[in-house]
């Protein structure tokens, strides 16, 4: 996983930015200089891309303790992938900041100068003084007022890899391997095959409530052109081909800075709903077009390991070409959801809504699919023979065997001699081979690499 480190002198707002990017209060923030002395870190999502965010201790030469903090910060910076250097926009640039910044530029990593506390026109004028740092990537921020973050996120996203493989983060792999005997079939957890939980997600006013009404053939949600009409989640169950499908119509997600009161509460409820869903209907408005917020909502689906169907709503009002639109979604905006089927509908007229019901059943079948160990290993053997694993500094890298250790979503373990040497591009190759052989349309495929005989799960 790539890492982003926040560096700067004390009291420039690193902890506030850290908390904002983490979307929770982790680092202690105050007006007292140097509140954060030890590095904090947490996993975050930039749109749909995962990264480790590190909040370093403040750089300062004023006392012996901070000299040690500076030394440790520079060490962590060398091991990080992206550097954000923060300065206080209410203060004039100083030589000490320039010195720190130049030393970091020499590391040859993507680096940006982030000018925080730019709260008004006067601050914006003062920010021009930082141009003499000699860096192109300068971002004016006001973390407290939520200004400038979108531009920063857009820049960061360019340097983050999109992993089609969701890293395994659960302890059940270790529990599984403790009792697993090579070559044996495993008794998977029980999943109710007759009850499917589906979350309907999307930004405000894309037609989620109309879609729910069309799916259940009755008006259960209040429909209005007023953005954000639906605040409380609404559950409705139907029976389709002897399967119970439980729909949850979530409150629309607004852009940051426009979430107020009940709407903010609804956003939190949306996260909870996704955590209890198995399949997500990601609703997009083809009449209004797509935007960055759509991508962020798609990232929530990825975050929760859900099966997914992309629903192009209001297609009757759209002038888009379907094939061209699907290609754009899969190659550009939603390339991290390239495995998701795309279906065009008109929720208000009910056109093609019935297609969604059959597709939900199919995706759920894929979501709970079990692969025979023998078939999986035959595929892995053929794939590695066709494209041998790259050596690790001259040493042989070998996959001893592969086994599916969980479902909903399907999770596969690769038992290896050198799991850290398995590059993400080769993982992607294996994933594509597995998808070709077995039908995993619409579902994420988790692949974890583990060293044979070790108790530690090893992810590359």
UniProtKB/Swiss-Prot annotation:
Residues 2-164, 196-368 form the EngA-type G domain. Gene3D superfamilies: 3.30.300.20, P-loop containing nucleotide triphosphate hydrolases. PROSITE patterns: G_ENGA. GTP 2 binds at residues 202-209, 249-253, 313-316. GTP 1 binds at residues 8-15, 55-59, 116-119. It comes from the Bacteria. GO terms for molecular function: GTP binding; ribosome binding. It holds the Pfam family MMR_HSR1. Residues 369-453 form the KH-like domain. One of its GO terms (biological process) is ribosome biogenesis. Keywords: GTP-binding, Nucleotide-binding, Repeat, Ribosome biogenesis. CDD domains: EngA1, EngA2. GTPase that plays an essential role in the late steps of ribosome biogenesis. Belongs to the TRAFAC class TrmE-Era-EngA-EngB-Septin-like GTPase superfamily. EngA (Der) GTPase family. Associates with the 50S ribosomal subunit. This is GTPase Der. It comes from Campylobacter jejuni subsp. doylei (strain ATCC BAA-1458 / RM4099 / 269.97).
